[in-house]
Curated annotation (Swiss-Prot):
Belongs to the GeBP family. Residues 49-72 have a biased composition (Low complexity). This is Probable transcription factor At1g61730. The keyword Phosphoprotein applies. Residues 1-150 are annotated as: Disordered. It comes from the Eukaryota. It comes from Arabidopsis thaliana. The modification Phosphoserine is found at S49. GO terms for molecular function: transcription cis-regulatory region binding.
Length: 376
């Protein structure tokens, strides 16, 4: 009959921690299954069971008892196996402690997880969203565009090169279509061309541009060999020469705003002087009616005038005089022509007065000769 050992007198030897590890891992796996949604990494905790710790407390007594009963080693071995089989309650309590420990860890984990999650939230508050950054960038671009629009340009040219050519060509076309010079009716010429200009031009701007183009041509014409930097300048000069040249279509360049030229006023003065000469003399020269000397637009009057001979009498070659006369602007030529014609009219008037004076003196001589007695 086997001897039953009292567990108090002969406690079982402390087992290794392998069983506790297995129990703890089983408890950790159970807890991991329940909290898989909260934790991704399984928690492995090693906790020794109380039976193991309590059993490990009196090792000396167990060794003493075991030495006293060395002969009964076989029975002790059987008793140890029986005690191990009777220890499941202690192992169960170890599992319970492991589960409680895991549950405590779970209760502490939400705070740590919330703390870790709170950090990105704080960082996200400091970082500016991409949409807000894009809106700020677009606002800056709009402000830059507005500033670039508000900045005034240095010099804005109203008349383009095409507009200048259009004005010159328009003067030629107006003369060809209407048969009148653009200076005769400036209002009609303005209405004829204003819609073709690239901008809304006023009457004053239109006339100022014509005067500036003529002035530019006169400055070029005074040179022996005018040079041109651009093809536009050369084309403008050729058109201007066709308009304001010696045989241009706008010979009556000195035009007032009402369309009456200085030349017409000078003609009226000459006509009045000639009429007075005719009435004072009692008859016209050679019995013929005095004709108006309005000048021939087809030829240059200077070449056939006495001015060339008078200037040449001072020691200057006639050919050189005529050549230099061709370099004078059309406007200056017209002024000289008008003055020369007025001077000729005054010369005729002086000749008439001189003739009257000589007639009176001759009449006195005749009367004196009649009253003188004849010598015997």
């Amino acid at each position: 009959m086997t001897k039953k050992l009292n567990p108090l007198e002969d406690p079982p030897t402390a087992t290794s921690s392998d069983e506790d590890d297995v129990e703890t891992s089983e408890a950790g796996e159970a807890s991991d299954d329940s909290s898989s949604s909260e934790e991704d990494v399984p928690i492995k905790i090693r906790i020794k069971s109380p039976s193991a710790t309590t059993a490990a407390a009196p090792p000396a007594k167990s060794t003493a008892v075991s030495t006293a009963a060395d002969s009964d080693s076989g029975s002790e071995t059987e008793t140890d196996s029986d005690s191990e089989s009777t220890n499941p309650p202690n192992s169960g309590s170890g599992k319970t402690i492991a589960l409680n420990t895991v549950n405590l860890k779970k209760k502490e984990d939400p705070t740590s997880s919330s703390a870790t999650l709170a950090l990105p939230a704080m960082k996200s508050g400091t970082k500016r969203p991409a949409s807000e950054a894009a809106a700020t960038t677009s606002t800056k671009r709009v402000k830059k565009d507005e500033e670039s629009v508000k900045k005034p340009g240095g010099f804005q040219r109203l008349w383009s090169e095409e507009d200048e050519i259009l004005v010159l060509q328009g003067m030629i076309d107006f003369k060809a279509d209407t048969g009148k010079s653009p200076y005769v009716d400036t209002n009609a010429f303005y209405d004829f061309l204003k819609k073709s200009i690239s901008f809304e031009v006023s009457k004053n701007q239109f006339m100022d541009k014509i005067r500036s183009l003529r002035k530019k041509y006169i400055g070029k014409e005074g040179r022996n060999e005018p040079s041109f930097v651009k093809a536009h300048d050369k084309k403008a000069f050729e058109l201007s020469k066709f308009i304001w040249g010696p045989k241009g279509i706008a010979l009556d360049s000195n035009v007032k705003s009402n369309g009456v030229s200085k030349k017409s006023v000078a003609k009226k003065k000459i006509d009045s002087v000639k009429q007075e000469l005719v009435f004072a003399g009692g008859s016209s020269t050679n019995g013929k009616k005095v004709e108006e000397d309005g000048g021939d637009d087809g030829c240059d009057w200077f070449d056939n005038s006495s001015l060339v001979r008078m200037i040449a009498s001072l020691g200057v070659d006639e050919y050189y005089v005529k050549q230099q006369w061709s370099l004078v602007s059309v406007e200056s030529k017209k002024i000289v022509e008008e003055k020369y014609k007025l001077l000729q009219a005054k010369e005729l008037e002086f000749v008439l007065e001189k003739t009257k004076f000589l007639n009176e003196v001759a009449s006195m001589f005749v009367e004196a000769s009649k009253n003188k007695p004849l010598d015997t």
